[in-house]
Amino acid sequence: MSASLSRAAAALLRWGRSAGGGGLPGAGVRAASSGGQAEQLDALVKKDKVVVFLKGTPEQPQCGFSNAVVQILRLHGVRDYAAYNVLDDPELRQGIKDYSNWPTIPQVYLNGEFVGGCDILLQMHQNGDLVEELKKLGIRSALVDEKDQDSK
């Protein structure tokens, strides 16, 4: 898995993003795995405030659900996040599913905690919870700025 994570990190750097930051423990259930895979994934999801595992890249999502997650983050003005393309690495793709005990991709983590996939992020966007969660991370949603402009 170490080589897999190296490829994922290299892909992340190719996207022009440097990883940094910290986080709280993830809420997902971890499956026992060999070679410290869970520990390596734990480090990945905690490395940045917002981490997304998707099919493709933010610039070129390869499935509608991954595209929806990217678009929701863009609507909120979230541009600084770590994105890992699971299509580049089958071990990473299966490993993150085992790590979170969630069967599908994309997967979104906020401050090291597993949030869910596209459907949950969309629901959080629609009911306003995403604005609040981003605020807890010190990220001001662009939608709040837009509302402020409209009220003036």
From Swiss-Prot:
One of its GO terms (cellular component) is iron-sulfur cluster assembly complex. [2Fe-2S] cluster binds at residue 63. Belongs to the glutaredoxin family. Monothiol subfamily. Homodimer. Interacts with ISCU. Interacts with BOLA1. The modification N6-succinyllysine is found at residue 55. Residues 1-31 form a transit peptide. The modification Phosphoserine is found at residue 151. One of its GO terms (biological process) is hemopoiesis. GO terms for molecular function: 2 iron, 2 sulfur cluster binding; metal ion binding. PANTHER family: GLUTAREDOXIN FAMILY MEMBER, GLUTAREDOXIN-RELATED PROTEIN 5, MITOCHONDRIAL. Its main location: mitochondrion. It comes from Mus musculus (Mouse). It is found in: Mitochondrion matrix. This is Glutaredoxin-related protein 5, mitochondrial. Glutathione binds at residues 55, 93-97, 105, 118-119. Residues 38-141 form the Glutaredoxin domain. Detected in bone, liver, muscle and kidney.
